[in-house]
Amino acid sequence: MSEHNVYGAAQPAQPGQPAQPRTRIRTHHLQKMKAEGHKWAMLTAYDYSTARIFDEAGIPVLLVGDSAANVVYGYDTTVPVSIDELIPLVRGVVRGAPHALVVADLPFGSYEAGPAAALAAATRFMKEGGAHAVKLEGGERVAEQIAHLTAAGIPVMAHIGFTPQSVNSLGGFRVQGRGDAAEQTIADAIAVAEAGAFSVVMEMVPAELATQITGKLTIPTIGIGAGPNCDGQVLVWQDMAGMSSGKSARFVKRFADIGGELRRAATQYAHEVAAGVFPADEHCF
């Protein structure tokens, strides 16, 4: 099977038959990709317009991340963002992406109290936002929540290693799983898989350890700063496209300079308006 078709793109037409339309990516498609050795990309998305572009590009999974706290709302960390701030973003992404699996982050404070709190938060994202799955941070400590959500029919993406919501207790942005801590990271990965998570994000984990965990688990692993051997990779789209300000994390590669292009376009637009060049005759009725 070609990579193009694995992503749910239109199937080639047989002689005398129309092409088959793309289908919505589901969790079992990701499992099949892992089994067949196909790697896949995930990006964050926070609005209809970018979700539409990423969906057209064939990105199979879109994450409405709590990173919206930083890139949408301007908070310093992901801790302050609320469910009420995230649900409208999820709605827009779901409308813009008819083919991608849309995953919503459960924000800090919405699930730590226990399974009942996690179910209440996840249910809101599924019912009010239209999300197809939710993501929550933590390993063994949230296994009970993951099991409760999956038993209720809610697909869960886990997140281990560096967990941004715990930045204050982790002592800042630090690689996790080095040395003796590797065993705990492995235990976390096994715990979330056994609890029923359909995939697990591994953030800022040594590449060798991430490779080991990917080999141990039957569910897909998704790396962000976890080396090239995870089943999938994820980046915040503003980091990937050159929209973020300041120094990028080591694991980020900029694939474009969208920020620079927007600044140039806005500057040129303002200049032409001030000079009376825009609107020209061709823009008038």
Curated annotation (Swiss-Prot):
Record GO biological process: pantothenate biosynthetic process
Positions of the catalytic residues: 203
Region (Disordered): 1-22
MF terms in GO: 3-methyl-2-oxobutanoate hydroxymethyltransferase activity; magnesium ion binding
Binding residue positions for 3-methyl-2-oxobutanoate: 66-67, 105, 135
Keywords: Cytoplasm, Magnesium, Metal-binding, Pantothenate biosynthesis, Transferase
EC number: 2.1.2.11
EC primary class: transferase
InterPro entries: Pantoate_hydroxy_MeTrfase, Pyrv/PenolPyrv_kinase-like_dom, Pyrv_kinase-like_dom_sf
Reactions catalysed, as given in the entry: 3-methyl-2-oxobutanoate + (6R)-5,10-methylene-5,6,7,8-tetrahydrofolate + H2O = 2-dehydropantoate + (6S)-5,6,7,8-tetrahydrofolate
Cellular component, GO annotation: cytoplasm
Subcellular location: Cytoplasm
One Pfam family here: Pantoate_transf
Subcellular location, principal: cytoplasm
Cofactor(s) needed: Mg(2+)
Keyword rRNA-binding recorded: no
Alphabetical list of HAMAP family matching this protein: PanB
Family note: Belongs to the PanB family.
Quaternary structure note: Homodecamer; pentamer of dimers.
Name of this chain's protein: 3-methyl-2-oxobutanoate hydroxymethyltransferase
Organism per entry: Mycolicibacterium paratuberculosis (strain ATCC BAA-968 / K-10)
Source organism phylogeny: Bacteria, Bacillati, Actinomycetota, Actinomycetes, Mycobacteriales
